[in-house]
Curated annotation (Swiss-Prot):
Family to which this protein belongs: Belongs to the YqgF nuclease family.
Protein name, per record: Putative pre-16S rRNA nuclease
Protein function: Could be a nuclease involved in processing of the 5'-end of pre-16S rRNA.
Pfam families: RuvX
């Protein structure tokens, strides 16, 4: 189920279970995982497959393996806050994922996270090819970190 309010999302979480975050791009998906205490976000994986059924199968395996209690999906909106074509694609994906899992899903504004992730990796001296292979997972961890920081204030 897609939850629009962060407090409601937090209320539905199972204690001592991690969250995953997804940075859904047009060519690949970045995935990040929190610790059980919901205090740390870590890049986990990048999926280069964009077929929704395959992606959902991979996500179901991750959810089962790590005993995840909720999902955060980065919602791409433009700088003015307007909905874009990519926003609609991500919303459709979120709705498909919601049909496949019985976990709360929260959509988090993700403006500029992939660019910030790429810049962060660049500042560490990571080569362009490696940055492009990992920037979505790092962006997912930034999206997750934003939510974890907000949860601390609830």
């Amino acid at each position: 189920m897609i939850i629009k309010n962060l407090q409601e999302f937090y209320r539905l979480l199972i204690p001592n279970a991690p969250l995953i975050a997804i940075d859904y791009g047009s060519k690949k998906l970045g995935i990040a995982l929190s610790n059980q205490e919901l205090s740390i976000a870590m890049p986990l994986n990048t999926i280069t497959e964009i077929n929704t059924k395959i992606v959902i199968t991979v996500l179901l395996n991750i959810i089962e393996k790590y005993k995840v209690c909720g999902v955060i999906i980065g919602l791409p909106i433009d700088m003015s806050g307007a909905v874009t074509e990519q926003t609609n694609i991500v919303m459709k994906f979120a709705e498909e994922l919601a049909k496949s899992i019985n976990l709360p899903i929260y959509l988090q504004d993700e403006r500029l996270t992939t660019k910030a992730a790429n810049n962060l990796l660049k500042s560490f001296g990571v080569k362009r090819k490696d940055r492009n292979n990992n920037d979505d997972a790092v962006a997912a961890s930034m999206i997750l970190e934003t939510v974890l920081d907000s949860i601390k204030n609830i």
